[in-house]
Amino acid sequence: MFDLSLGITVDPSVRFGKPVIKGTRVPVDTVVARVASGMSIKDVAEEYGITEKDIYNALHYAASN
């Protein structure tokens, strides 16, 4: 398992090694897609049981990689 910056992890045994929010099985690309589709940060956080900070970290990670 790789613990990447910003609370993002990559583990081959979780979601086939896709980057996920640390401590969850929520893929970064899913979070980014929801925000890109117009869903609010608050609604995404509530839907996936993650924090708003997790969402901003996922967006930052996606923009950097």
Can you annotate each of these PLM segments?
Residues 5-26:
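Short, Lys/Arg-enriched anionic-surface-contact patches
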Residues 27-65:
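Long, charge-rich, low-complexity alpha-helical segments
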